[in-house]
From Swiss-Prot:
Family stated for the protein in its record: Belongs to the spermidine/spermine synthase family.
NCBIfam families for the chain: PRK00811.1 (NF002010), speE (TIGR00417)
Lineage per the UniProt record: Eukaryota, Fungi, Dikarya, Ascomycota, Taphrinomycotina
CDD domains named among the record's database cross-references: AdoMet_MTases
Species: Schizosaccharomyces pombe (strain 972 / ATCC 24843)
Name the UniProt record assigns to this protein: Spermidine synthase
Residue ranges occupied by any PABS domain in the UniProt entry: 13-248
GO biological process: pantothenate biosynthetic process; spermidine biosynthetic process
GO cellular component, one term: nucleus
Catalytic reaction list: S-adenosyl 3-(methylsulfanyl)propylamine + putrescine = S-methyl-5'-thioadenosine + spermidine + H(+)
Length: 298
């Protein structure tokens, strides 16, 4: 099926343009080889296309969520920064992450006994299973359970249950807005066991320092141990995205993994993450460090 036969308003002259108010004055463009899916779920616009250079691309409400070429740098970091900051994570919850990529990373940890994913949009899961098989492979693992529903409401039913909770959300200008505010972080804390760890998607230091500061301030009112890390990823705005990493254990250094794979295991399991980059991801440029330090100091 050609671009002309199945298209989308953001694709013009064979190019996808990521124009969004969250990053005004700039846009990522990718050359489109073939539109694979274009539709609207109950919650958002869903687009999948085959690009010339980045493989299959998942786009929600006009914003790139994942591409086959670079998705691993995000999925690995948001998962392993949290999981390797916990001494023995057995029960893990993923909020969002309907493409399955974070689940794929979670089940690489043999100590994990159960991984639950809660995503509000079943269509994203269905589309990902069809068009993003390498990412959605996580859904096939026997340790995985899937719940379709609102993550905020899901958490209200759980107390002292999970060792690690990973929030793989879209940007805070749509259905994920509530996942960037203090009441949500309180629910996360309540749902964690002692020593529990969270990671959450926390935007880009180059264009969202105000958002990052507000999120860190909110998390710090709930968790005693809060840090900010980042990864590089070409198809996200300005080429990087950050994570809030927080623990209920005030004594641990989140920049130093409590558990490590051997170098051989790391090379086999991961394309981006390793124990050295775990530590390095918390080292911030001065302009960002100053904002982060101010938001997390108490």
């Amino acid at each position: 099926m050609s671009v002309q036969e199945l298209s989308h308003p953001l694709i013009k002259d064979g190019w996808f343009r990521e124009i969004n108010n969250m990053w005004p004055g700039q846009a990522m463009t990718l050359k489109v080889k073939k539109v694979l899916y274009a539709g609207k779920s109950k919650y958002q616009d869903v687009l999948v296309f085959e690009s010339e250079t980045y493989g299959h691309v998942l786009v929600l409400d006009g914003a790139i969520q994942a591409t086959e070429r670079d998705e691993f740098s995000y999925q690995e970091m948001i998962a392993h920064l949290a999981l390797n900051s916990h001494p023995n994570p057995k029960k893990v919850l993923v909020i969002g992450g309907g493409d399955g990529g974070v689940l794929r990373e979670v089940v690489k940890h043999e100590c994990v006994e159960e991984a639950i994913l809660c995503d509000i949009d079943e269509d994203v899961i269905k589309v990902s299973k069809q068009y993003l098989p390498e990412m959605s492979a996580g859904f096939n693992h026997p340790k995985v359970k899937v719940h379709i529903g609102d993550g905020f409401k899901f958490l209200q039913d759980y107390q002292n249950t999970f060792d690690v909770i990973i929030t793989d959300s879209s940007d805070p200008d749509g259905p994920a807005e509530a996942l960037f505010q203090k009441p949500y972080f309180q629910l996360l804390s309540d749902a964690l066991r002692g020593g529990g760890v969270i990671t959450t998607q926390a935007e880009c230091m180059w264009i969202h320092l105000g958002v990052i500061s507000n999120v860190l301030t909110a998390v710090k009112t709930v968790f005693p141990n809060v840090r900010y890390a980042y990864t590089t990823i070409p198809t996200y705005p300005s080429g990087s995205i950050g994570f809030v990493v927080a623990s209920k254990d005030a004594s641990i250094d989140l920049s130093k993994p409590l558990r490590k794979w051997s170098p051989e295991e790391e090379n086999k399991l991961c394309k981006y993450y390793n124990s050295e980059i775990h530590a390095a991801s918390f080292v911030l440029p001065t302009f960002a460090r100053d904002v982060v330090d101010k938001a997390t100091s108490s």
